Amino acid sequence: MAHKKAGGSTRNGRDSESKRLGVKRFGGEAVLAGSIIVRQRGTKFHAGINVGCGKDHTLFALADGKVKFEVKGPKNRKFISIEAE
């Protein structure tokens, strides 16, 4: 005869893997063409001059230069540009 009642099962205990989103190159940093600047969900940051936007909204450098963050427009949107050297 068992001396302990059987333990119940739980439906918790799992979590999704982190997606490593965020800014990868900060303002003033030198980058090469093709370098990833930001990984994001949606357009928290918008592509400015010399910056491309991938299908998953990843921003990347189209030219060598320095990263520049700026807030522009009537809606105060955040843009990332590359100032060519």
Curated annotation (Swiss-Prot):
One Gene Ontology term of the molecular function aspect: structural constituent of ribosome
Keyword annotations: Ribonucleoprotein, Ribosomal protein
A GO BP annotation: translation
Ranges for region Disordered: 1-20
HAMAP family: Ribosomal_bL27
Similarity comment: family membership: Belongs to the bacterial ribosomal protein bL27 family.
Protein's name in the database: Large ribosomal subunit protein bL27
Native species: Yersinia pestis
Gene: rpmA
